[in-house]
From Swiss-Prot:
It comes from Bacillus thuringiensis (strain Al Hakam). Keywords: 4Fe-4S, Amino-acid biosynthesis, Branched-chain amino acid biosynthesis, Iron, Iron-sulfur, Leucine biosynthesis, Lyase, Metal-binding. The gene is leuC. GO terms for biological process: L-leucine biosynthetic process. GO terms for molecular function: 3-isopropylmalate dehydratase activity; 4 iron, 4 sulfur cluster binding; metal ion binding. This is 3-isopropylmalate dehydratase large subunit. Its EC number is 4.2.1.33. SUPFAM superfamilies: Aconitase iron-sulfur domain. Binds 1 [4Fe-4S] cluster per subunit. [4Fe-4S] cluster binds at C337, C397, C400. Its cofactor is [4Fe-4S] cluster. Belongs to the aconitase/IPM isomerase family. LeuC type 1 subfamily.
């Protein structure tokens, strides 16, 4: 019987197996940020250890930094974490993309764009959404602080091999429907625990037609379905994306040949298989307090099925049977490691070009990295956003999470391109609705959600 992509990635990195069936995996790339690393570095000091492979480690500042005045860090804990990362990287000789550096950005945006992320690698980071890098045919997953220390010290990690889930996507997406809608559909249909104990492999004709940045969105949110990771077999689009990037291999042809071996054999069997036809998918909007609480834009909110639904409706200030079009939007956030890349900003800009943000709506665009920001500005996207009434910010995690100055006030609703809508995720009492960049941009113009499949809404929006 053939092997799955997961099998090939896993087997090539097993150093040894212990009596409990745990495998010691070699880690090819360790990404680090300011929030989950301080205790790990301190652990090295206390045990008089060094970073085993600083050349396979890369750090950036993203979670805590302000995106408006990046050097004006008023929060004491945030400043301490940023200063500590700077000191730790200097002491342990770990490369750091500091504030203002041309390589700085959200950790899961800069990894791919710098060419650090490559097919066949094992990649870890002290962050849940490390699965993003799986879009390149890498086995990438988030780890805890104690594991961060273990990888820093040994460049290895004890792991139990997960099962393999195949998610086959077929059909062509309608205009106005995106990868974000696919993953929100998957979660709404199968729930936040469907992937527990599995690595999700996305494949099929829909995947083949997707560009790399859409694939990253899919893999980014595999963790929201409980999966260990999300992966996609590398192809010509993958190779073309990596080629020529700063940290990509110089002997590219040799590596491309090796990378081409990472795919699921035709006679391999998944432990679980899910088939989704995307042809009739609509834009999705989450209404509740986890990413599976979502509906199509043309559906009404569901009835209360259990105590969790009741709590979610109460927290969100919504009612069963309410129209998605009637959900008020006071804030719009276009950013995060899910949807802050150049193509995401281009889609959002195409929606708002020549239009105005509705009075009373606060709208932010936060590029995922310095390089994304510069590329967007070269295309004039910043002018489109600013003329429409958006705030054009510096890169960072921003409003994705309530760990920096960009937060949603209590009781107010935010159309967000991020990945989590938990209670308090964007600030105390914040009400988060997960959507695609197009849906978020359109909501900024109307102050409520509209259907981005339509060419225009009351004649007010047209795509260029």
């Amino acid at each position: 019987m053939g092997k799955r992509l997961l099998d090939k990635l896993w087997e090539r990195h097993v150093v040894t197996t212990n009596e409990n069936g745990l495998d010691l995996l070699y880690i090819d790339l360790h990404l680090v940020h300011e929030v989950t690393s301080p205790q790990a570095f301190e652990g090295l000091r206390l045990t008089n250890r060094t970073v085993r492979r600083p050349d396979l480690t890369f750090a950036t500042m993203d979670h805590n930094i302000p995106t408006k005045d990046v050097w004006n860090i008023t929060d004491r804990i945030a400043k301490q974490q940023l200063d500590t990362l700077r000191e730790n990287c200097k002491q342990f000789q770990v490369p750091l993309a500091d504030i203002g550096d041309e390589e700085q950005g959200i950790v899961h945006v800069i990894g791919p764009e710098l060419g650090l992320t490559q097919p066949g690698k094992t990649i870890v980071c002290g962050d849940s959404h490390t699965a993003t890098h799986g879009a390149f045919g890498a086995l990438a997953f988030g780890i805890g602080t104690s594991e961060v220390e273990h990888v820093l010290a040994t460049q290895t990690l004890w792991q139990r091999k997960p099962k393999a889930m195949g998610i086959e996507l077929k059909g062509k997406l309608q205009k106005g429907v995106y990868a974000k809608d696919i993953i929100l559909h998957l979660l709404s249909k199968y729930g936040v625990a469907v992937g527990t104990g599995y690595v999700m492999e996305f494949y099929g004709e829909t995947i083949e037609s997707m560009e790399m940045e859409e694939r990253m969105t899919l893999c980014n949110m595999a963790i929201e379905g409980g999966a260990k990771a999300g992966i996609i077999a590398p192809d010509e689009k993958t190779f073309a994306y990596v080629k020529g990037r700063k940290y990509a291999p110089k002997d590219y042809e040799t590596f491309e040949k090796k990378w081409s071996e990472f795919y699921t054999d035709v006679d391999a069997m998944y432990d679980l298989h899910i088939l989704i036809d995307v042809t009739d998918l609509a834009p999705y909007v989450t209404w509740g307090t986890n990413p599976s609480m979502g509906v199509r834009i043309d559906e009404r909110l569901p009835e209360k099925n259990d105590v969790n639904d009741e709590r979610a409706f109460s927290y969100m200030g919504l009612s069963p049977g309410q129209s998605t079009y009637d959900i008020p939007v006071q804030h719009v956030f276009i950013g995060s490691c899910t949807n802050s890349r150049l193509s995401d900003l281009e889609i959002a800009a195409s929606v708002v070009k020549g239009k105005k943000v509705k009075e009373g709506v606060r709208a932010l665009v936060v590029p995922g990295s310095k390089r994304v920001r510069e590329a967007a500005m070269q295309k004039g996207l910043h002018r489109i956003f600013e003329e429409a009434g958006f705030e054009w910010r510096e890169p960072g995690c921003s409003m994705c999470l309530g760990m920096n100055p960009d937060q949603v006030p209590e009781g107010e609703h935010c159309a967000s391109t991020s990945n989590r809508n938990f209670e308090g995720r964007q600030g105390k009492g914040a009400r988060t609705h997960l959507v695609s960049p197009a849906m978020a941009a359109a909501a900024a113009l109307y102050g409520h959600f509209v259907d981005t499949r339509k060419e225009s809404y009351d004649g007010a929006i047209s795509y260029s």
